[in-house]
Amino acid sequence: MGNNLSVILITKNAERTIETTLKSVSWASEIVVLDSGSTDNTLNIAKNYTSKIFISESWPGFGVQRQHAQNYATNDWILMLDADEQISEPLKNSILQAIKGPDCIYEINRISIAFGTVIKHSGWFPDWIMRLYPSKLTKYDDALVHEKLIVPDGMACKKIEGLLIHE
């Protein structure tokens, strides 16, 4: 596919949502799945979209697991997703434009949906999260939970158009 983008997912027992997620990023050059020991159909579903599936049953926490997964990626750009998130078409188009430009960390507006309703209160909307970034210049911190992308000094951060849908 030649767009220099690696999409990364860390998973465990995500059979209910992972196919929708993978369909939404099937246009990416590379999809990397790092699984933490799923006992459901997660891995069989993932095999329909990528051969880059790795297993790490030890659980060092979200930050370290994301770092581990990033080590398997081979492209210049990383899009880090959860197994219950999908890329909207406008976001896809924005990503494809962004990765043609200079190195920058991009913040994506994530909308969270619960029981069929977009959550627009309690700080959940807008929910700008850093998920698109140059693979060689940054990574996630070591946090067990609520991990954050490390922003190098002088690195530009920009907002990108389109929505990341979290169900």
Question: What is the meaning of each model-derived region?
Answer:
Residues 63-70, 77, 81, 88-167:
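Catalytic-site signature of metal-activated, phosphate-bearing donor transferases
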Residues 16-19, 40-49, 90-91:
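Acidic helix N-cap motif at the loop->helix transition within catalytic regions
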